[in-house]
């Protein structure tokens, strides 16, 4: 067996949405590229709700597509519902949004990346940047492999020193049941970079078999055929599925208020500021205390999945 020499033009660390686009773009522009991921079965994993686009975000996906990116194509191929938001306004305000099959989304990304010339994929964890003469020239991995590169792109998402909060319980991790990555943050600090911690949250998922859909309002997808990509004509491959609408009530709010003392957002555990337009359910009932209900969307996670995502109900409250 010939010794494998790890010399690349570009190494991309992390195979989420940004990393996949960066690696794909670099390879297609002719650079010998390596994409490093902790888990090759989680490439392009949709960490929160299995949806792409929406107001403002949908325009960004189309801009990525116009510049030759792959996200729009992957989304179209994995869509289980497509809707144009803001239809009551003029066309300039319309925003495309797609519900995706979480498993299919990963599979479509893998198909694209594994058939892209100049692109290799390596499963490992980067723990250190190799720097010589003030210049990044490679990475060192948890397995002890050193890889050379002319440039390194960090697209680490939530994994650098990631910390998960379940009420007062704290667990190191980048996502549920996935480990954090240590070493890079500490090295960046030593090199003089300022680092900070960002916060995001996600709701518990619910089992489809436990839902009484007769009590919910069905939200169908659009019947006219829209898509994200201008570059690829895709016929819907998957069964189109409905989302469902419901609301919290005062009884829900009372239960949530009783647990606020155990919420990391309100007991001092979490100091970071969360995303502006995606507040947790705790934040909603505190900030908008005058509201007697909040809208929730139950979204399917895939054609063959029993999991439903509760959009509008992200929380760091304990499981109780």
Describe each model-derived feature in a short phrase.
Residues 5-18:
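Beta1/beta-strand and adjacent pyrophosphate-binding region of the FAD-binding site
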Residues 226-270, 292-320:
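Conserved FAD/dinucleotide-binding core of flavoprotein oxidoreductases
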Residues 130-146, 152:
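Conserved beta-strand-loop-beta-strand element in the redox core of flavoprotein oxidoreductases
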Residues 268-280:
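Amphipathic alpha-helical blocks
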Residues 11-13, 146-157:
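Short hydrophobic core segments
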Residues 6-7, 24-128, 143, 155-175, ...:
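Conserved N-terminal/central alpha/beta ligand/cofactor-binding core
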Residues 201-216, 220, 280-281, 285-295, ...:
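Terminal amphipathic helices with adjacent charged low-complexity linkers/tails
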Residues 1-3:
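Short, Lys/Arg-enriched N-terminal segments with co-localized hydrophobic residues
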